[in-house]
Swiss-Prot record:
It is an enzyme of class 7 (translocase). Keywords: Cell inner membrane, Cell membrane, Electron transport, Membrane, Translocase, Transmembrane, Transmembrane helix, Transport. This is Ion-translocating oxidoreductase complex subunit A. The gene is rnfA. Belongs to the NqrDE/RnfAE family. Part of a membrane-bound complex that couples electron transfer with translocation of ions across the membrane. It comes from Cronobacter sakazakii (strain ATCC BAA-894) (Enterobacter sakazakii).
Length: 193
């Protein structure tokens, strides 16, 4: 049980995919202008990343490894991610049309989000069991969502702040992301792998 807790905390805080591994920066910068869209994107990414990691583990261990087709891992995982994203898009369109309109182009872009593919590949490369792989995917998604929501909240406050003209817009957003990354470096001694 302690191993699972350490895996969760380590993935969410210490080895955050956005601020430490620099994966998923496109949606991180693109969807974080409004808190509502960041929350929606975080929930959609959490759903997709968790399911994609689980299905990728299953396909790898039941099909690719037994048939010695591990060289097709990346292509197979991209296909899994695309199917999960299409399923998520259909669910979001039916359950929350407002969220579907709010996410707009970013929902299909989850397919090309390098963080989703990176989590699936890293989970396999780290030789996780099924439960560890599922928890790793969920933890990475929670870390991604946490950072996106925090960043969106900060960016909303920066809109009304008195920011010097050369730093307005993306410049102050990048400075803020760098400061957040430094803040998350403080968690580096929390969990040792």
């Amino acid at each position: 049980m302690t191993d699972y807790l350490l895996l969760f905390v380590g993935t969410v805080l210490v080895n955050n995919f956005v601020l430490v591994k620099f994966l998923g920066l496109c949606p991180f910068m693109g969807v974080s202008k409004k808190l509502e869209s960041a929350i929606g994107m975080g929930m959609a990414t959490t759903f997709v990343m968790t399911l994609a990691t689980i299905f990728s583990w299953i396909i790898d261990h039941l099909i690719l490894v037994p048939l010695e087709l591990v060289y097709l891992r990346t292509m197979a995982f991209i296909l899994v991610i695309a199917v999960v994203v299409q399923f998520t898009e259909m669910v979001v369109r039916k359950t929350s049309p407002a969220l579907y309109r709010l996410l707009g182009i970013y929902l299909p872009l989850i397919t090309t989000n390098c963080a989703v593919l990176g989590v699936a590949l890293l989970s396999i490369n780290l030789n996780h069991t099924f439960m560890q792989s599922a928890l790793y995917g969920f933890s990475a998604a929670v870390g991604f969502s946490l950072v996106m929501v925090l960043f969106a909240a900060i960016r909303e406050r920066l809109v009304v702040a008195d920011v010097p003209l050369p730093f307005r817009g993306n410049a102050i957003a990048l400075v803020t992301a760098g400061l957040m990354s430094l803040a998350f470096m403080g968690f580096s001694g929390l969990v040792k792998f």
